[in-house]
Regions:
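An N-terminal domain-cap segment
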Residues: 15-49, 54-55
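SAM-dependent nucleic-acid methyltransferase catalytic core
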Residues: 2-27, 35, 80-196, 200-211, ...
Length: 286
């Protein structure tokens, strides 16, 4: 079997996620990395900030997310890295509280927002993500970015080397970038593929649920449907690894599979007192 495990040591350059993302997996990489089996295609249907994907750098991959703005960022990095860098440098020059709210308000006027080019939209999201409070990408029920100004003295708005390296990798690898329902990304996968699933987590309390990345939520019914999709992958002989909250509901739901509890530090939370170490689970069928 041909392995799509990595791009190869000679071509490999370390890549850092371009966006800060709630539930980002950088804290869990040391646990996830040794578990990833040999595979022909790597699939990540809830790619988010892509910490695992960019760490692994598979030769052949399918990445997907429901968030259109996020996927537009990856498409722009792949296709227009220099234009993106130029726009981010302009944002950096003008960065201030007043400017932040001016850029944030662009999506309040749909007609004007639709006039933005994909590169302008991508630069806007990266700029807001780097300068908003605690790095929260959050939208309201109308789909408008609503995280407040972060008051950072010297935010890292643009990393030119990282954007260029990420663009080179996305163009060199056989990576399909999709936007839509995660189930569509799973269709057509064959035995030999490997799927890493990092869905919106099951909330541990009524106040801890964070589904602000898209205006639609991901509740108990969606978690049950996700388990059904995992069962379908298992029947096809496709290996999967899933991360989720460490709670009775998830452990009972996946009781037929291998479950490992791992400690994870949550750096991003709207409430400072909720940040810190908390157990999560890694579920796998191999």
């Amino acid at each position: 079997m041909t392995s799509s495990h990595t791009t190869g040591a000679s071509a490999r350059q370390e890549l850092t996620p371009i966006l800060k993302w709630v539930g980002g997996k950088r804290q869990l990489l040391d646990f996830i990395r040794p578990l990833i089996p040999e595979h022909t295609t790597y699939c990540e249907p809830f790619v988010g900030g892509g910490a695992g994907f960019f760490d692994l750098q598979p030769k052949k991959a399918v990445i997907n997310d429901f968030n259109q703005e996020l996927i537009n960022v990856y498409q722009t990095v792949k296709e227009q890295p220099e234009e993106l860098i130029e726009l981010l440098l302009r944002h950096r020059e003008q960065n201030s509280q007043e400017y932040f709210y001016q850029i944030r308000a662009l999506d309040r006027e749909p007609e004007k927002y639709e006039e933005l080019t994909p590169a302008q939209r991508a630069a806007r999201i990266i700029y807001l993500n780097k300068t908003c409070y605690n790095g929260l990408f959050r939208v309201n029920s109308a789909g408008q970015f609503n995280a407040p100004w972060g008051r950072y003295k010297n935010p890292n708005i643009v990393s030119e080397d990282n954007i260029r390296a990420m663009s080179r990798y996305l163009n060199k690898s056989k990576t399909t970038i999709r936007c839509g329902d995660y189930r569509e990304a799973l269709k057509g996968l064959r035995k030999g593929a490997f799927v890493y699933l990092d869905p919106p987590y099951m909330p541990l309390s009524s106040s801890s649920s964070f589904t602000g990345y898209t205006a639609s939520g991901f509740g108990q019914a969606e978690q049950i449907e996700l388990k059904r999709q995992c069962d379908l992958l298992n029947k096809k002989g496709i290996k999967f690894l899933l991360s989720n909250s460490c709670c009775d509901f998830i452990e009972d739901l996946y009781s037929g599979y291998q479950i490992e509890r791992v400690p994870a530090k949550r750096a991003i939370n709207a409430r400072a007192d909720r940040r810190g170490a908390i157990d999560e689970v890694l579920v796998r069928n191999f």
